From Swiss-Prot:
Pfam families reported for this sequence: Ribosomal_L27
Top-rank lineage group of the source organism: Bacteria
InterPro entries: Ribosomal_bL27, Ribosomal_bL27_CS
Protein's recorded name: Large ribosomal subunit protein bL27
GO CC field: cytosolic large ribosomal subunit
A GO term for molecular function: structural constituent of ribosome
Source organism (scientific name): Pelotomaculum thermopropionicum (strain DSM 13744 / JCM 10971 / SI)
A GO BP entry: translation
PANTHER family noted in UniProt: LARGE RIBOSOMAL SUBUNIT PROTEIN BL27M, RIBOSOMAL PROTEIN L27
Gene that this polypeptide is encoded by: rpmA
Region (Disordered): 1-21
Gene3D superfamilies linked: 2.40.50.100
Disulphide linkage map: none
Key words of the record: Ribonucleoprotein, Ribosomal protein
Phylogenetic classification of the source organism: Bacteria, Bacillati, Bacillota, Clostridia, Eubacteriales
Length: 88
């Protein structure tokens, strides 16, 4: 017979690093060209006017301006940047 108790090991104890996803700039906020607006997986929010989409679906401002979130249809969200000249 064993004189020591067999010690099992838990099969838990792992987790992935946080990915810091989500909306980074609010509606009505002024942004500079190149600013990241949304970090996401897939196109949950679609790029609108003056907004580009990166290879990892990150949305970024192409011009200086004011952020505008819109809803088109029942379930499609878009984010646009209204240029500074037009916003004044």
């Amino acid at each position: 017979m064993a004189h020591k108790k067999g010690v099992g090991s838990s099969r838990n104890g792992r987790d992935s690093q946080p990915k810091m996803l989500g909306v980074k700039r609010a509606d009505g906020q002024f942004v500079l060209a190149g600013s990241i607006l949304v970090r996401q997986r897939g196109t949950r929010i679609h790029p609108g006017r003056n907004v580009g989409r990166g290879g990892d679906d990150t949305l970024f401002a192409k011009v200086d301006g004011v952020v505008s979130f819109e809803r088109s249809g029942r379930d499609k969200k878009t984010v646009s940047v209204i240029p500074v000249e037009a916003a004044l």
